[in-house]
Amino acid sequence: MKKRCVAFTILLCCFLAMTLCAHTDAPVNLSDISAGASYYFKNTTKLRAEVKNSYFIQQGSATDGEYGYFLALSNEKGDCTILKVDLSDYTIVSETPGVAVDHGNGMAYNPKTKQLIVSRCTDHPNRLSFIDKDTLTITGSVEMPMRVISVTYNESRDQYVVVHNHDRQFSILDSQFNILSTYDMVEDMFSNQDIDCDEQYIYLLQWQSSNGSNVNYIGVYDWDGNYVNRIKVRSLSEIESMFHIGDRVILAFYAGQVIVGEAQLYQAE
């Protein structure tokens, strides 16, 4: 019995030592991102939406701080449904079909104009369309000098960022959509998806299909166009769009339906 107790004590001590020495990845915020470290998002699914009438391909998304607005594409119809989602409990408030924004690859929200701005991407590749956030109807548009795949907006800077659809570049625009600066992207092996930003960083979503699996990364740049780092997104689905409210990050995916989740950022040890 004494030998068994000694053996058990030794095993217990070894287990405790291993536990104390084990590294645990630390949760961090977007503002904590810096060069040299390794980061990843762990996503928790909050909504799986079976949208009516063939609208099931998630594309761009944006938020006004209370609701999320998600574009669901119909390849059959060539337009989108806008899903308005209450972000307090992820219930769908409304579905607005037949919104003529083509592919609707990217979307931003401008609280100063109370408009959603959509990059149309396919049939009208240079066009950004404006949508009234209350009526969810198109109220106007602007033609850009280049093809645009995605768009985001930062209120404190009063500036937009757009990703080009014909090269590996992104541009910063003023509030009237005039180009202020253009920068090259570092990652060149992935397909560009939507884009997000805050006062500190610009987040460029990228996806690649590799051996039948989806590989998702988010490139992080500062507002001077400098590449800072990238975030790996741990998900088997194709990432489509991202927005965040403070430190609360919402990601949208496509996997045969619209999938929305909340993501926690971790710094890998």
Residue ranges and their predicted role:
Residues V28-Y55:
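A short helix->beta-strand "capping" segment at the edge of beta-propeller domains
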Residues K42-K52, T91-P97, T137-E143, N178-V186, ...:
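A short beta-strand motif characteristic of beta-propeller blades
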Residues R48-D79, H103-G106:
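Beta-strand-rich domains and repeat architectures in extracellular enzymes and scaffolds
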Residues S54-A62, V101-Y109, M144-S156, D188-C197, ...:
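Repeated scaffold domains used in trafficking and secretory/extracellular systems
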Residues K77-L83, H124-F130, D167-L173, N211-G219, ...:
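Structural motif
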Residues D86-Y90, I131-L136, D174-N178, Y221-N226:
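Short loop/turn segments that connect beta-strands within beta-propeller blades
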Residues Y90-L116, R120:
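Blade-loop segments of beta-propeller domains
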Residues E187-V220:
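Loop/turn-rich, solvent-exposed surfaces of beta-rich toroidal or solenoidal domains
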